[in-house]
């Protein structure tokens, strides 16, 4: 019961975050659809450079080792370590705001990837793609978990994570593989 004496549609889980106890609305599914779309775009941004190695090497004077560092280390290092920091912020703060900031960071970094003039600028741009994308999954799963009851949250989380595979497939198509 809430302060008004009416039954509350939200209850706190053991982490203190509210958990949904109501039937799902169309808006809840709209949120999942938007997170799915963001997941697709995020994964395209993440992997498409791997499919464009030859055109990038033709444009920029990069060695195989530098291409490997740009497509692997640059993204992964900040994705992994940033994910820990950003995940903690998401648990303590406003998930939608943090997700929005992460999307802006990785979108700007993706644009910077396209205008990079050499190894250093490309490496830095890919690092920022990694730090931006590090917040996507923790924020999205938290947002979905708040909107759906514990007994029904599996389907929307599965839909969200399916976006990774759809994005990977689209990256292959867009990258010409």
What are these regions (language model features)?
Residues 61, 94, 115-121, 132, ...:
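Helix-breaking motifs and short loop linkers at transmembrane-helix boundaries and internal kinks
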Residues 47, 75-84, 134, 168-169:
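Residue-level signature of mid-helix packing/kink "hotspots" within the transmembrane helices
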Residues 125-164:
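Cytoplasmic helix-loop-helix junction between adjacent transmembrane helices
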Residues 55, 84-88, 177:
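Membrane-interface helix termini in secondary transporters
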């Amino acid at each position: 019961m809430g302060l008004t004496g009416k039954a509350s549609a939200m209850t706190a889980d053991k982490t203190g975050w509210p958990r949904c106890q109501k039937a799902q609305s169309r808006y809840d599914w709209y949120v999942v659809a938007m997170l799915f779309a963001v997941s697709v775009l995020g994964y395209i941004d993440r992997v498409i450079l791997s499919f464009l190695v030859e055109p990038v090497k033709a444009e920029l004077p990069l060695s195989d080792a530098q291409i490997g560092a740009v497509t692997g280390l640059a993204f992964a290092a900040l994705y992994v370590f940033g994910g820990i920091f950003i995940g903690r912020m998401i648990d303590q703060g406003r998930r939608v705001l943090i997700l929005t900031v992460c999307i802006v960071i990785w979108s700007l970094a993706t644009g910077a990837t396209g205008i990079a003039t050499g190894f250093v600028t490309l490496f830095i741009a890919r690092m920022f793609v990694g730090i931006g994308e590090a917040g996507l999954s923790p924020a999205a799963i938290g947002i979905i978990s708040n909107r759906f009851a514990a007994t029904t949250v599996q389907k929307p989380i599965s839909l969200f994570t399916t976006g990774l595979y759809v994005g990977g497939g689209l990256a292959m198509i867009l990258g010409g593989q």
